[in-house]
């Protein structure tokens, strides 16, 4: 089962209307059940002129290769895509998935793959 299939399964089983955190936790359960290595809530420092000036928190990093960023909003937008690209730049990883579990009935999970 791949990341996209897992996300679809989560949304089918849980349905809409939960917080991003609930879907995040469900992804952790699914990854553990499948024996897939992941890190949750990795702190990613932001550097400027040799100084750490802040940080971002990556939702999940799978197999030290793929960033997963979860949302529970109406639809993915440019700001979310920029956030995903920032994660790739700051981590040096090549792939991120933006996964949105939109509220409301009759919706589908929205997945956008970003590559560096």
State what each model feature region is.
Residues 18, 22, 51-55, 75-78, ...:
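Residues at secondary-structure transition points
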Residues 15, 58-76, 87:
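Conserved catalytic cores of phosphodiester-cleaving nucleases, focusing on short active-site segments
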Residues 1-37, 95, 107-108, 112-116:
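Solvent-exposed, charged helical/coil patches
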Residues 48-51, 106-108:
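Acidic pyrophosphate-coordinating catalytic loop
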Residues 71-116:
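Nucleic-acid nuclease catalytic cores
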Residues 34-50:
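A short acidic/basic microdomain associated with nuclease active sites
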């Amino acid at each position: 089962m791949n990341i996209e299939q897992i996300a679809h399964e989560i949304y089918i089983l849980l349905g809409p209307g939960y917080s991003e955190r609930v879907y995040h936790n469900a992804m952790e359960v699914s990854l553990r059940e499948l024996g897939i290595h992941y890190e949750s809530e990795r702190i990613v420092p932001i550097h400027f002129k040799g100084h750490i000036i802040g940080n971002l928190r990556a939702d999940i990093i799978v197999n030290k290769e793929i960033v997963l960023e979860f949302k529970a909003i109406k639809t993915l937008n440019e700001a979310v895509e920029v956030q995903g690209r920032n994660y790739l730049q700051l981590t040096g990883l090549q792939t991120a998935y933006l996964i949105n579990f939109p509220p409301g009935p009759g919706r589908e999970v929205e997945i956008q793959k970003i590559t560096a």
